[in-house]
């Protein structure tokens, strides 16, 4: 946020002028878009438990073998690890959305994730499915189309933010595939 403000100040200072006109309008647009971004992150964060548990439940419904003896979600400890991993992935997706940049997701979450899952015997196709379900839910919350829960939204189109969060989820899918 400071970068946008700093750019405007530096630009105005180089002209020996007050911040006004198009620079002021650019800041207003930035602030309005920033509020939408904060709201989008808040929608994900305030619904994260629901998003993750629904994704894991959906993954298990489609592959019931995961909760049978020998399955990767069999025993409470493994189920808890699966839910924890879903929470971590969604948390880093929300960080990327907040920053408007995928580097935090790439560096701190995805780097080495596939190799770790392979070493632990985690089926990547199940992870891909869970992330796909989380993606659909996050997009619904951001675009305010979630069927069971509507939220107060800032006026304006949030489709760009919905697309952005979808792209971060797609990065997760690509990283573990």
Swiss-Prot record:
<keyword id="KW-0793">Thylakoid</keyword>
<dbReference type="GO" id="GO:0009535">
    <property type="term" value="C:chloroplast thylakoid membrane"/>
</dbReference>
<dbReference type="InterPro" id="IPR009050">
    <property type="entry name" value="Globin-like_sf"/>
</dbReference>
<keyword id="KW-0472">Membrane</keyword>
<keyword id="KW-0813">Transport</keyword>
<keyword id="KW-0249">Electron transport</keyword>
<keyword id="KW-0150">Chloroplast</keyword>
<keyword id="KW-0934">Plastid</keyword>
<feature type="binding site" description="covalent">
    <location>
        <position position="61"/>
    </location>
    <ligand>
        <name>phycourobilin</name>
    </ligand>
</feature>
<dbReference type="InterPro" id="IPR038719">
    <property type="entry name" value="Phycobilisome_asu/bsu_sf"/>
</dbReference>
<feature type="binding site">
    <location>
        <begin position="77"/>
        <end position="78"/>
    </location>
    <ligand>
        <name>(2R,3E)-phycoerythrobilin 1</name>
    </ligand>
</feature>
<keyword id="KW-0157">Chromophore</keyword>
<dbReference type="InterPro" id="IPR012128">
    <property type="entry name" value="Phycobilisome_asu/bsu"/>
</dbReference>
<protein>
    <recommendedName>
        <fullName>R-phycoerythrin beta chain</fullName>
    </recommendedName>
</protein>
<comment type="subunit">
    <text>Heterododecamer of 6 alpha and 6 beta chains. The basic functional unit of phycobiliproteins is a ring-shaped hexamer formed from two back-to-back trimers contacting via the alpha chain subunits. The trimers are composed of alpha/beta subunit heterodimers arranged around a three-fold axis of symmetry. The phycoerythrins also contain a gamma subunit which is located in the center of the hexamer.</text>
</comment>
<dbReference type="Pfam" id="PF00502">
    <property type="entry name" value="Phycobilisome"/>
</dbReference>
<dbReference type="GO" id="GO:0030089">
    <property type="term" value="C:phycobilisome"/>
</dbReference>
<keyword id="KW-0602">Photosynthesis</keyword>
<feature type="binding site" description="covalent">
    <location>
        <position position="158"/>
    </location>
    <ligand>
        <name>(2R,3E)-phycoerythrobilin 2</name>
    </ligand>
</feature>
<feature type="modified residue" description="N4-methylasparagine">
    <location>
        <position position="72"/>
    </location>
</feature>
<feature type="binding site" description="covalent">
    <location>
        <position position="82"/>
    </location>
    <ligand>
        <name>(2R,3E)-phycoerythrobilin 1</name>
    </ligand>
</feature>
<feature type="binding site">
    <location>
        <position position="72"/>
    </location>
    <ligand>
        <name>(2R,3E)-phycoerythrobilin 1</name>
    </ligand>
</feature>
<keyword id="KW-0042">Antenna complex</keyword>
<keyword id="KW-0488">Methylation</keyword>
<feature type="binding site">
    <location>
        <position position="35"/>
    </location>
    <ligand>
        <name>(2R,3E)-phycoerythrobilin 2</name>
    </ligand>
</feature>
<feature type="binding site">
    <location>
        <begin position="147"/>
        <end position="148"/>
    </location>
    <ligand>
        <name>phycourobilin</name>
    </ligand>
</feature>
<comment type="similarity">
    <text>Belongs to the phycobiliprotein family.</text>
</comment>
<dbReference type="GO" id="GO:0015979">
    <property type="term" value="P:photosynthesis"/>
</dbReference>
<keyword id="KW-0605">Phycobilisome</keyword>
<feature type="binding site">
    <location>
        <position position="54"/>
    </location>
    <ligand>
        <name>phycourobilin</name>
    </ligand>
</feature>
<feature type="binding site" description="covalent">
    <location>
        <position position="50"/>
    </location>
    <ligand>
        <name>phycourobilin</name>
    </ligand>
</feature>
<feature type="binding site">
    <location>
        <position position="39"/>
    </location>
    <ligand>
        <name>(2R,3E)-phycoerythrobilin 2</name>
    </ligand>
</feature>
<keyword id="KW-0089">Bile pigment</keyword>
<feature type="binding site">
    <location>
        <begin position="84"/>
        <end position="85"/>
    </location>
    <ligand>
        <name>(2R,3E)-phycoerythrobilin 1</name>
    </ligand>
</feature>
<comment type="function">
    <text>Light-harvesting photosynthetic tetrapyrrole chromophore-protein from the phycobiliprotein complex.</text>
</comment>
């Amino acid at each position: 946020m400071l970068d946008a403000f700093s750019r405007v100040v530096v630009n105005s200072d180089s002209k020996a002028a007050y911040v006004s006109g198009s620079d002021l309008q650019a800041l207003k647009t930035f602030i309005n878009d920033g509020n939408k971004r904060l709201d989008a992150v808040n929608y994900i964060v305030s619904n994260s438990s629901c998003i993750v548990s629904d994704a894991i439940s959906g993954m298990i419904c489609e592959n019931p073998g995961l909760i049978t003896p020998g399955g990767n979600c069999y025993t409470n400890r493994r189920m808890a690890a699966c839910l924890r991993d879903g929470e971590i992935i969604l948390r880093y997706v929300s960080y990327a959305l907040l920053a408007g940049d995928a580097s935090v997701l790439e560096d701190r979450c995805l780097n080495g994730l596939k190799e770790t899952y392979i070493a632990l015997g985690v089926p990547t196709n199940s992870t891909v499915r869970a992330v796909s379900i989380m993606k659909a839910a996050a997009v619904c919350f951001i675009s305010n189309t979630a069927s069971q829960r509507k939220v107060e939204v800032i006026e304006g189109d949030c489709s760009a933010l919905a697309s952005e969060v979808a792209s971060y989820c797609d990065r997760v899918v690509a990283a573990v595939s």
